[in-house]
């Protein structure tokens, strides 16, 4: 019998999905595409109601901010020095108020205003559960950082 997703770790899930991509393509949170300019880094993260946020703990504005911050943090950790922009996929039940959606996009806009980049586009769909999937695009600086390249003795800096 096939295991359920609840029974698999994230690492095991990525290992199983890796057969669908070029070697080492899924070994990091970002992908790098060659370009005439600096390579383009691409990252996607999903946040889901009831798992990553809830009305009891998170305002709509904070939901939008958090979604952008998660993506831009991954880009920065991979060596991005310039944010091109993001796309947003929003899924929400029909009962979701416009005020909630407006607040989410206000948070998205505020985060982009502080860290750079623009809203490039996206998609909206009706669904049973609210979620945001953001894809962020940034330009690589002089140093491409890979989480799987860390070695004992390397310096780790957080802020």
Spans of model-derived segments:
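Extreme N-terminal cap/leader segments of soluble proteins
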Residues: 1-59, 88, 107-112, 116, ...
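Glycine-rich anion-binding loops of enzyme active sites
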Residues: 37, 82-159
